[in-house]
């Protein structure tokens, strides 16, 4: 069995994983991921008990219980690269023996649910609504660095999207990965469903124009008009595709759920969105406590 070199998986001197600074025993099977470290406190204030709180860089983690169910909530920071770190290190905490540096014989499946904020790209989706990313669409290219990319992606959907948008060849190839079906069933009665884009940036990658124009100024209109059967693209965020793709490759359950705080078609945004986020958090905690 392969022994993972110390240069590939760095374990700190205190037995914690390199970036997250967590020990395996500090990780629950249910993990809620948020971008903002401040949102960790917002979620963990609902916990009945707290067993640990660990902070390193932008990664703040609290493990405790909610209605008797053990959960971990962790901030990832912003962007796809941070999701690559978080999901890989969470999987290592669950499935690598730190003493032998080998994969454990018994696989431990994690449930990874991202709770985020997002901008709607369809006129009928209002600020304050909650969207479940039944499929994540990645503009980032991360999953193509991993073996097995085509095994977890919807290649027909990818081809249809590339053709519809006349996708610029110098950009990373877009990819589509479905959320876990059990998690969709869990949340479907409390959310809208759609295809959610994960962009590798906040400005031009999402069609925003401040001083430098996007390469394709009509891309958002093409995105808005794209349909595949009865499916359509509903919203933008910045992390979900890597979460869905890596979780699928590693065998974990994953989903991204976002509160809409901007209406890109109407060119409006809400800056006082915390009540909407809190409502999403309460809903998600109650749902996850039933697993």
Language-model regions, residue ranges each:
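A short, acidic, amphipathic alpha-helical segment used as a generic capping/interface helix at domain edges
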Residues: 220-226, 230, 236, 240-246
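Glycine-rich beta-alpha junction loops
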Residues: 119, 136, 197-204, 242, ...
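His/Asp/Glu-rich mid-to-C-terminal helical/loop segments that flank catalytic regions of hydrolases
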Residues: 263-291
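Intrinsically disordered, low-complexity segments enriched in small residues
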Residues: 21-24, 200-206, 278-287
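Generic structural signal for well-ordered, non-membrane alpha-helical segments
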Residues: 33, 40, 76-83, 87, ...
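Zn-dependent metallopeptidase/amidohydrolase metal-coordination segment
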Residues: 241-272
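Metabolite-binding pocket within alpha/beta catalytic cores that recognizes anionic/polar moieties
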Residues: 1-175
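Active-site rim beta-loop-alpha module in soluble metabolic enzymes
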Residues: 156-228
